[in-house]
UniProtKB/Swiss-Prot annotation:
Participates actively in the response to hyperosmotic and heat shock by preventing the aggregation of stress-denatured proteins, in association with DnaK and GrpE. It is the nucleotide exchange factor for DnaK and may function as a thermosensor. Unfolded proteins bind initially to DnaJ; upon interaction with the DnaJ-bound protein, DnaK hydrolyzes its bound ATP, resulting in the formation of a stable complex. GrpE releases ADP from DnaK; ATP binding to DnaK triggers the release of the substrate protein, thus completing the reaction cycle. It comes from the Bacteria. Its main location: cytoplasm. One of its GO terms (biological process) is protein folding. Residues 7-22, 29-55 have a biased composition (Basic and acidic residues). This is Protein GrpE. SUPFAM superfamilies: Coiled-coil domain of nucleotide exchange factor GrpE, Head domain of nucleotide exchange factor GrpE.
C-alpha cells in the first residue's frame, strides 16, 4: 500500500511539518527579542555620578603627588649618599696616610732636638750633625710630597688657636699681647688638616 493512499501517514507527516514550522518561528522570535532579553541586564548597571568620579580622580591625583614626593625624596637621599661616598673616598686618598705620618713626627722631633744642641768643633760630632740635618731635610721633603706642611711660626706672629697650642702665657714688656714669644715644638698639617698644633709660648 502506498503512503499516498494512507490517510494516517499523511496526518503524521502534516503534524511533523507543523512542528518544524513552529520551531522555526520560535527561533525567529527569539532572535527578534534578543535586544529585549538584554535590556534587563542594562537596566541593572549603575553608572557612577560625576561627583563620585571627581572624588576618585582627586584621590588618584593625591596618590600620584605622594608617589612623586617619595620618588624625589629617595632621589635626594641617593644623591646625598653618592656625595658622601665621594667625599669619603677623597678623604681616604688625602688622609689615608695620616696614621703613618703621625707616627713619623717623633722622628722629626728627635732630629730637630739633636740639631738644637750646642755646636761642637769635634769632627765626629760635626759629621753627625750634618747627617742629621740631611736626614731631616729628606724626611721633610718626603712628607711634603704627601701633602704635609710644617707649622713653624716666628716670634711676634699672632697666636692662632687653630694652628698653635699655647703651653704658657708670659708677660713680656716688648711683646704685643696674644703674640708668639717662643716656639717649643713645630706643628704639622696634612692637606690643610692639622695633625699636631705647634706648641708655643704666648705673650700676655
Amino acid at each position: 500500500m502506498s503512503s499516498k493512499n494512507n490517510p494516517e501517514s499523511e496526518t503524521k507527516a502534516k503534524n511533523k511539518w507543523e512542528k518544524v514550522m513552529e520551531a522555526e518561528e520560535e527561533q525567529e522570535e527569539g532572535r527578534g527579542d534578543g535586544s529585549q532579553e538584554m535590556e534587563p541586564h542594562r537596566e541593572g548597571l549603575e553608572f557612577p555620578s560625576r561627583e563620585k568620579l571627581e572624588g576618585q580622580l582627586t584621590r588618584m591625583e593625591r596618590k600620584v603627588d605622594e608617589y612623586k614626593t617619595q620618588y624625589l625624596r629617595a632621589q635626594a637621599e641617593m644623591d646625598n649618599l653618592r656625595k658622601r661616598i665621594e667625599r669619603e673616598k677623597a678623604d681616604i686618598i688625602k688622609f689615608g696616610s695620616k696614621q703613618l705620618i703621625t707616627d713619623l713626627l717623633p722622628v722629626a722631633d728627635s732630629l730637630i732636638h739633636g740639631l738644637e744642641s750646642p755646636a761642637s768643633e769635634d769632627p765626629q760630632v760635626k759629621s753627625m750633625r750634618d747627617g742629621m740635618s740631611l736626614t731631616l731635610d729628606l724626611l721633610h721633603n718626603t712628607l711634603a710630597k704627601h701633602g704635609v706642611q710644617v707649622i713653624n711660626p716666628n716670634p711676634g706672629d699672632p697666636f692662632d688657636p687653630a694652628l698653635h697650642e699655647a703651653m704658657s702665657v708670659q708677660a713680656v714688656p716688648d711683646a704685643k699681647p696674644d703674640t708668639i714669644i717662643q716656639v717649643l715644638q713645630k706643628g704639622y698639617q696634612l692637606n690643610g688638616r692639622v695633625l699636631r698644633a705647634a706648641r708655643v709660648i704666648v705673650a700676655g
